[in-house]
């Protein structure tokens, strides 16, 4: 032994003795395992024949046997399917999952219930555990089912005429269906006469889809199911594409769609949203613009609320648009109706419809059209009502010295946009004597016959009422718009007062434009005399002077615009 301590190697004989001793211990353990009665038919853990020794049976030690028995029991975990009545799943799960948690704790078996029955009267459950724990779980589940069947009130709650239907609600929509404080699900139950239960807890993991159980008459259950699915669809269609048949309409509300020309969108919204807030507060509705598709000459505003309030808000919006047209000169587009051309309706269904053209400008002038930060092209879009954009990918064989712009809109809008682009690039049309005289804005009509109507006899939006859910309730406007002196028109005019120029500053540009105000005044005087000479049951109000003043303002405005454009081109 001293030699071993000093690190010398042990003799070969001692190594052989150690191996024999270890082998002897292995044989003893194998003999004990083989001597266990209920393991006699099983395969031994260690086969002594591998080492060339026979099996020797030894007395069983109690401690070792108990440990080995526990290991054997751990290996006998199985899975079994068990079915329970679909109508009683809620009773088995219990409030907050208390019942099913108690069953699992008492039996030692894990219970997983399928989320839906797929229309069959029984719901499959998966039981996982030892055979003893599975049997215990079956016994406890059977007790609950028997107690529910024989208990009082069960048949009162679910009779032969009632049906139960479950729909799986996405986890992100559970709160939407329940509502704040359970308000939405309460309204659904009151309106449909069914009972709804959202199964929040149970074996389902957190964040998973939750089943909504609907109990009641078959027809009412189906109606409630459709209403729930409609709420979910509404949430998914939050981009407001298409006319929205929204759930609030069933609760006493509704929505209409009002078309707003592009140039008037900013006017309806107002500075920092002040105007649209004022409209909402005054009418008691909610207004939201649909996303801009970049193509249509109009933007759609969704007005949501009671029908009468929606109509009131639509009327206010139309007043703002008409006021803006009168004030900023866009009224010529609508005023052109009845001047012999019959053009200028803002609606998409106007004569000619929405068109698209390609307009070419020199490459070195492209920056003048776009402007710093896109200011010029935005101004062109606002003033014309058309949509102008630069073609990013020109045709392969196109001239590199030219740039192409795409203009979309009705013919009048396209023509105005072309005129504005020519101003920016200094085109030949800029200095022509009749540059603006050829546009629908300021061109005087030929002497009309007696049946010619005044330029604004039908108002700016003749088709607006038809667009509002197909309910034409609009009243034709006769003569100049009277609302210019009302609150909404004056509000917009007040915003525009700082930008007005002194009349003396407009005198020079006016001299370059032919003055048609006198001709229009004479024309309306003749019309007035002819109308007074004819026998009428009731004489309409005389708008002669008002129309004369209106056309003086039109000539003054476009004369000023032309003068500014000429000065700008001379500076360049």
Curated annotation (Swiss-Prot):
Residues bearing Phosphoserine are 296, 539, 569
GO molecular function terms here? Answer: mRNA binding; RNA binding; single-stranded DNA binding
Q: Residue positions of the PTM Phosphothreonine?
A: 76
InterPro entries xref list: KH_dom, KH_dom_type_1, KH_dom_type_1_sf
Region annotation (Disordered) maps to 426-521
- The residues joined by the cross-link Glycyl lysine isopeptide (Lys-Gly) (interchain with G-Cter in SUMO2) are 15, 57
Summary of the tissues where the protein is detected = Detected in a number of cell lines.
Ranges of residues in domain KH: 77-141, 162-228, 253-317, 354-421
Report biased composition (Low complexity) as residue ranges.
Answer: 496-514
UniProt keyword list: Acetylation, DNA-binding, Isopeptide bond, Nucleus, Phosphoprotein, Repeat, Transcription, Transcription regulation, Ubl conjugation
Compartment(s): Nucleus
Q: Which residues carry this modification: N-acetylalanine?
A: 2
Broad class of the protein's primary localization = nucleus
- Annotated membrane-spanning segments are none
Task: State the Gene Ontology BP annotations.
Answer: DNA-templated transcription; intracellular mRNA localization; positive regulation of DNA-templated transcription; positive regulation of gene expression; positive regulation of transcription by RNA polymerase II; regulation of transcription by RNA polymerase II
Gene Ontology CC, one term: neuronal cell body
Pfam families for this protein: KH_1 (PF00013)
Q: Does the keyword Oxidoreductase apply?
A: no
**What is this protein's function?**
May interact with single-stranded DNA from the far-upstream element (FUSE). May activate gene expression.
Q: What is this protein called?
A: Far upstream element-binding protein 3
> What organism does the UniProt record list as the source?
Homo sapiens (Human)
């Amino acid at each position: 032994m001293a030699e071993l301590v000093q690190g010398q190697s042990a003799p070969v004989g001692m190594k052989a003795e150690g191996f024999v001793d270890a082998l002897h211990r292995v044989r003893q353990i194998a003999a004990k395992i083989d001597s266990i009665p209920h393991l006699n038919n099983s395969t031994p853990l260690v086969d002594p024949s591998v080492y060339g020794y026979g099996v020797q049976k030894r007395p069983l030690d109690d401690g070792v046997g108990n440990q080995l028995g526990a290991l054997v029991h751990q290996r006998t975990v199985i899975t079994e399917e068990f079915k329970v009545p679909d109508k009683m799943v809620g009773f088995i799960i219990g409030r907050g999952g208390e019942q099913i948690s108690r069953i699992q704790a008492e039996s030692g078996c894990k219970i997983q219930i399928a989320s839906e029955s797929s229309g069959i009267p029984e719901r499959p459950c998966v039981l996982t555990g030892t055979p003893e724990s599975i049997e215990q779980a079956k016994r406890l589940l059977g007790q609950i089912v028997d107690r529910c069947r024989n208990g009082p009130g069960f048949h009162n709650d679910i009779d032969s005429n009632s049906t139960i239907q479950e729909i799986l609600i996405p986890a992100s929509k559970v709160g939407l269906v329940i509502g704040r404080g359970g308000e939405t699900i309460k309204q659904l139950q009151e309106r449909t006469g069914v009972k709804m239960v959202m199964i929040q807890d149970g074996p389902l993991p957190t964040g998973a889809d939750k089943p909504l159980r609907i109990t009641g008459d078959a027809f009412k259950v189906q109606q409630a199911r459709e209403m729930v699915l409609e709420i979910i669809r509404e949430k998914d269609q939050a981009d407001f594409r298409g006319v929205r048949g929204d759930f609030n309409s069933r609760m006493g509300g509704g929505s209409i769609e009002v078309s707003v020309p592009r140039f008037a969108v900013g006017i309806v919204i107002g500075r920092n949203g002040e105007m649209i807030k004022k409209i909402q507060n005054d009418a008691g509705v909610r207004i939201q613009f649909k996303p801009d598709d970049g193509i249509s000459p109009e933007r759609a505003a969704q007005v949501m609320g009671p029908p009468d309030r929606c109509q009131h808000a639509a009327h206010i919006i139309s007043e703002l648009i008409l006021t803006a047209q009168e004030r900023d000169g866009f009224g010529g587009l609508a005023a052109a109706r009845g001047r012999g051309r019959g053009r200028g309706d803002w609606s998409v269904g106007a004569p000619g419809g929405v068109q698209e053209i390609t307009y070419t400008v020199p490459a070195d002038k492209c920056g003048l059209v776009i402007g710093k930060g896109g200011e010029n092209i935005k101004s062109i879009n606002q003033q014309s009502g058309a949509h102008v954009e630069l073609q990013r990918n020109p045709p392969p064989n196109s001239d590199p010295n030219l740039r192409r712009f795409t203009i979309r809109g009705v013919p009048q809008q396209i023509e105005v946009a072309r005129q504005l682009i020519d101003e920016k690039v200094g085109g030949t049309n800029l200095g022509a004597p009749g540059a603006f005289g050829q546009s629908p804005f300021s061109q005087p009509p030929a002497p009309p016959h007696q049946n010619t109507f005044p330029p604004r006899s039908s108002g700016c939006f003749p088709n607006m009422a038809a667009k509002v859910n197909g309910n034409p309730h609009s009243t034709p406007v006769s003569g100049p718009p009277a609302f210019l002196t009302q609150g909404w028109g004056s509000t917009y005019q007040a915003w525009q007062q700082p930008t007005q120029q002194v009349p003396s500053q407009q005198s020079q540009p006016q001299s370059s434009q032919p003055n048609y105000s006198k001709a229009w005044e004479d024309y309306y005087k003749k019309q007035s005399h002819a109308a007074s000479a004819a026998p009428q049951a009731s004489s309409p109000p005389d708008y002669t002077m008002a129309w004369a003043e209106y056309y003086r303002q039109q000539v003054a405005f476009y004369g000023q615009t032309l003068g500014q454009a000429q000065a700008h081109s001379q500076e360049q």
